[in-house]
Design a protein with these regions (language model features):
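Domain-level signature for soluble enzymes in the chorismate/prephenate branch of the shikimate pathway
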Residues: 1-136
Length: 138
């Protein structure tokens, strides 16, 4: 029977990439990947046995621990960490203009935090605006 694996969607996110890597490490045969609309949806899907596994972020090098995930490990004692990987994250600034003309940068809060040093050096006057995690935004 094919295993269902929940992850923080939509398709094309780093969470999906991590899900593919982790299912290979776990030897899941042709898993079904289930994108979820929020971290709490991913957590609930595994806590309520709606999937066989879930892929969630535990921490990142800039912002530290992901509190929603850590809180879920306390709230749902039946959830446990089976495998962990380090997934390097690479961000890109996409614009149709010159760097000097950029006045706003839109991205997820985690991405803005991870790029804060570069942004402060290269776009010190740009307004940083938070968006939802979506590769479609690009």
């Amino acid at each position: 029977m094919r295993k269902q694996v929940a992850y923080l969607g939509p398709k094309g996110t780093y969470a999906e990439k991590a899900a593919h890597i982790l299912t290979k490490l776990a030897n899941f045969q042709t898993p079904i990947f289930v994108p979820c609309n929020g971290l709490h949806s991913v957590i609930k899907s595994i806590a309520y046995n709606n999937c066989d596994a879930a892929v969630v972020p535990i921490e990142n090098s800039v912002e530290g621990g992901v509190t929603a995930t850590l809180d879920a490990l306390w709230k749902y004692p039946e959830i446990y960490i089976n495998r962990a990987i380090v997934l390097p994250i690479k961000h890109a600034l996409i614009s149709d203009g010159e760097l000097s003309n950029i006045s706003e940068v839109l991205s997820h809060p985690q991405a803005l935090a991870q790029c804060s040093e570069w942004l402060s050096e290269n776009l010190p006057n740009a307004c940083l605006l938070y968006t939802s995690p979506s590769p479609r935004d690009a």
